[in-house]
Each structure stands twice: as structure tokens, then as C-alpha cells.
A protein has these predicted regions:
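Short helix-loop capping/hinge motifs at secondary-structure junctions, enriched
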Residues: 2-7, 35-38, 111-120
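Bilobed "Venus flytrap"/periplasmic-binding protein-like clamshell domains
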Residues: 5-78
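Pocket-lining segment of extracytoplasmic ligand-binding domains
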Residues: 45, 52-145
């Protein structure tokens, strides 16, 4: 209960996923902006996946982790007393960089996009509709998330959805 934000991670071992990818770059940037040298002031143990990070959280009551949603919510359901200290989006926004964290994008091959502009436009419109649907129909969306194996339980998906920043 001594952690209140990223600035409190100095001196701790922190478990995280996403080494050599966007999660690592975001974590390092936020830590550095909060006056923490990620190579000297704490130890980041990079886990192969969120399941590995969860095992450390279960073993050590003092463990800290930086986890993506919806896995953070799923972990809280499995580890008594586990809580979210700070949302990375909030930590990023507090830095007032004028930018947002982007962790996912839609990509298409240039030749396909140029040959199929109507299909691309239709996809983007339907994608936007699905985002609105998900935000407005959390319970139904959570049931689909469970059905398609994205998250094991609809209840966890529903609880995590508001924090997923879709």
C-alpha cells in the first residue's frame, strides 16, 4: 500500500511484459519523466507473458507489476489485495506531452488499400461502430469477449472494459 504512482517505483522490482516493444518504451519514458532511471533506480523483470507476471504477484505480497488491461483486472480477481495504483494513460497524460499513448493501430498493405478503398472505408466505419457498441453495451460486449476467448470470464471483461481505453 506504499505505492501511489510511478514515482514510487524507485527501489522496487517491477514485473512487466512487452520488452523491446511499445510497452517497454512507454514504461521507460514515463519512469524517466518522473525522475526514475529505469536502468539504475529499480529493477524491471521482463516476463514472457502476463501469466508469468501473475505468478510473481501470487508469490510475493510486495511485488509490483505493470500490466495491460484486461489482464490487470483479471489479476486483481486472482490476487487478494492487488490494486491498480496508476493507469499508464493517466501517467502519460500527466506529463502533458500533447500526445496520447498509442498501443494499437490498423494496418493494410498499400496495394490492397489503393485497390479496395470502399472495403477500407467500410471496415473503418464498422470498426468505429463496434467501438461505440462496446462502450454502450458493456455486458453484451463482455459476453462476446468471453465467447471468443479473449478473456476467460465475461465478468472480468465487463469490469475491465472502462479501463481499456478503446
Amino acid at each position: 500500500d506504499t505505492l501511489t504512482g510511478m514515482q514510487d517505483l524507485a527501489g522496487h522490482t517491477v514485473y512487466a511484459t512487452g520488452q523491446s516493444a511499445v510497452p517497454e518504451y512507454v514504461i521507460r519514458y514515463i519512469l524517466t519523466a518522473n525522475g526514475i532511471d529505469p536502468d539504475k533506480d529499480l529493477e524491471i523483470k521482463w516476463c514472457a507473458d502476463t501469466t508469468e507476471a501473475l505468478s510473481y504477484l501470487k508469490e510475493d505480497a510486495d511485488a509490483a507489476a505493470i500490466l495491460p488491461q484486461p489482464f490487470a483486472t483479471a489479476a486483481m480477481a486472482q490476487v487478494e489485495g492487488l490494486r491498480i495504483v496508476q493507469d499508464l494513460n493517466d501517467a502519460w497524460n500527466a506529463l502533458d506531452t500533447g500526445s496520447e499513448i498509442t498501443t494499437g493501430v490498423i494496418v493494410a498493405r498499400k496495394d490492397f488499400a489503393e485497390a479496395n478503398p470502399e472495403a477500407i472505408e467500410k471496415f473503418l466505419l464498422e470498426y468505429a461502430d463496434s467501438v461505440v457498441y462496446t462502450e454502450e453495451n458493456a455486458a453484451d460486449s463482455a459476453a462476446l469477449i468471453e465467447k471468443y476467448g479473449i478473456v476467460a470470464k465475461a465478468a472480468i471483461a465487463e469490469k475491465a472494459l472502462p479501463d481499456c481505453h478503446i
